[in-house]
UniProtKB/Swiss-Prot annotation:
Taxonomic source organism: Chelativorans sp. (strain BNC1)
Pathway: Amino-acid biosynthesis; L-histidine biosynthesis; L-histidine from 5-phospho-alpha-D-ribose 1-diphosphate: step 3/9
Gene: hisI
Protein name, entry field: Phosphoribosyl-AMP cyclohydrolase
Reaction(s) catalysed by this chain's protein: 1-(5-phospho-beta-D-ribosyl)-5'-AMP + H2O = 1-(5-phospho-beta-D-ribosyl)-5-[(5-phospho-beta-D-ribosylamino)methylideneamino]imidazole-4-carboxamide
Cofactor binding, note field: Binds 1 Mg(2+) ion per subunit.
InterPro entries documented for this protein: PRA-CH, PRib_AMP_CycHydrolase_dom, PRib_AMP_CycHydrolase_sf
Subcellular location field: Cytoplasm
GO biological process: L-histidine biosynthetic process
Entry-linked NCBIfam families: PRK00051.1
Lineage start: Bacteria, Pseudomonadati, Pseudomonadota, Alphaproteobacteria, Hyphomicrobiales
A single Gene Ontology CC term: cytoplasm
Family: Belongs to the PRA-CH family.
GO molecular function, one term: phosphoribosyl-AMP cyclohydrolase activity
Cofactor(s) required, per the database record: Mg(2+); Zn(2+)
Length: 139
């Protein structure tokens, strides 16, 4: 995979510029990552939460295909590359202080986002039963 040429300027110390300005200056954390929340562009279903480093974010912006940083593998990850369930990005938004991004995507292939084969990684609800937290299948 070819390295990206897109570079991000450091975040402004001026809060107004960060919150109201036109320059996208993502605030990566101490590990060089930004949180990426991913939803279905059609119906808004929450599909997954992942992380991006500068290269993954740049590749996503340049190609229109979602790329993430795998913390477990310490490597760039083109979502759906092996399964065929590529995430085609329709829009990217950032929050007020630019430390998280929201990707609205259309999933190709069979439409699965989760490695378990499900559409969403959020397929279980957390509840309390008999004083213990338990998981139940949702939907």
């Amino acid at each position: 995979m070819q390295a990206s040429e897109l570079r991000f300027a450091p975040p402004s110390a001026d809060k107004s510029a960060l919150e109201e300005g036109r320059l996208f200056t993502p605030r990566f954390d101490a590990n060089g990552l930004i949180t990426a929340v991913v939803t279905d562009a059609g119906d808004g279903t929450l599909l997954m939460v992942a992380h991006m480093n500068a290269e993954a974010l740049a590749k996503t912006l340049e190609t229109g295909i979602a790329h993430y940083w795998s913390r477990s593998r310490s490597s760039l990850w083109k979502k759906g590359e092996t399964s065929g369930n590529l995430q085609h990005v329709e829009s990217i938004s950032t929050d007020c202080d630019q430390d998280a991004v929201l990707l609205k995507v259309r999933v190709g292939g069979e439409g699965a986002t989760c490695h378990t084969g499900r559409r969403s990684c959020f397929y279980r609800n957390v509840k309390v039963e008999d004083g213990r937290p338990i998981l139940t299948e949702n939907g």
